Amino acid sequence: MAGAKEIRSKIASIKSTQKITSAMEKVAVSKMRKAQMRMAASRPYAERIRQVIGHLANANPEYRHPFMIERAVKRVGYVVVSSDRGLCGGLNTNLFKALVKDMAVNRENGVEIDLCVVGSKGAAFFRNFGGNVVAAISHLGEEPSINDLIGSVKVMLDAYLEGRIDRLSVVSNKFINTMTQQPTVEQLIPLVATPDQELKHHWDYLYEPDAKELLDGLMVRYVESQVYQAVVENNAAEQAARMIAMKNATDNAGDLISDLQLIYNKARQAAITQEISEIVGGAAAV
């Protein structure tokens, strides 16, 4: 019965792991719902501020904010939003693949790259992969604040204003739904003012103190809000990916337990049959 004992011990070990993955799945579900609420709360602001910038740009067409001026691209910056923890499937791996692909295109064109990394997994990746990381922040927690991001974002904005980078993009996972998280590379600046549907009505607005000053203030807020929205959405995507990963692990553990239980039953049956055969053989000899 030595084999049966080993199998029984393995079954007990897998059941213990299954309890852990099941608990982690339930925790991820709870955290995902909270993250979805934060994402839904911040999304209207992030979307609306871009519309307001479009209005302001059209209100003062002769003024072009530095963040709206296209120039020759010699160096680009990326704000890379990753997770602090693992056990979330291929979430970070898929994000890094999309980023590396975009970086390769820039490098083929002779464009240099600077990186601002959010999350421990991103920092660990670039320590191995290599890259010019000029700013990094991690351990934002389950409820990130925009104030925690301002310092790192300012490093990239100052680099753009001083001409050290010519384009800034944010790289993060978009939360499509519970089953789908999509890695995206989205250009932040220079921002191209897109005509808004409301502008077709030629409505007039009064701006105090004036459109130029408002635009100067809003452009920085716009970039900060977009990075914050990326962090919040990435958090929701992380929890969804972790929930799915832990559910798959729990289900796989159940399948493995069933297979081992069958093997255990066969081993036990074989041992009992062997014992009966030995008893019958001994009785016949007597």
UniProtKB/Swiss-Prot annotation:
* GO CC field: plasma membrane; proton-transporting ATP synthase complex
Where does this protein reside within or beyond the cell? Cell inner membrane
The protein's role, per its UniProt record: Produces ATP from ADP in the presence of a proton gradient across the membrane. The gamma chain is believed to be important in regulating ATPase activity and the flow of protons through the CF(0) complex.
Sorted alphabetically, which PANTHER family does this protein's record hold? ATP SYNTHASE GAMMA CHAIN, ATP SYNTHASE SUBUNIT GAMMA, MITOCHONDRIAL
Protein name per UniProt: ATP synthase gamma chain
Q: Which family does it belong to?
A: Belongs to the ATPase gamma chain family.
Assembly and interaction partners: F-type ATPases have 2 components, CF(1) - the catalytic core - and CF(0) - the membrane proton channel. CF(1) has five subunits: alpha(3), beta(3), gamma(1), delta(1), epsilon(1). CF(0) has three main subunits: a, b and c.
The lineage is:
Bacteria, Pseudomonadati, Pseudomonadota, Gammaproteobacteria, Pseudomonadales
Keywords, sorted A to Z: ATP synthesis, Cell inner membrane, Cell membrane, CF(1), Hydrogen ion transport, Ion transport, Membrane, Transport
Q: Which GO terms describe its biological process?
A: proton motive force-driven plasma membrane ATP synthesis
Say if the entry is tagged with keyword DNA repair.
no
Q: Which HAMAP family match?
A: ATP_synth_gamma_bact
Q: Name one Pfam family in it.
A: ATP-synt
Q: Predominant location of this chain?
A: membrane
Keyword Acetylation included in the entry's annotation: no
Q: How does it sit in the membrane?
A: Peripheral membrane protein
Q: Which domain of life is it from?
A: Bacteria
Gene Ontology molecular-function annotations: ATP binding; proton-transporting ATP synthase activity, rotational mechanism
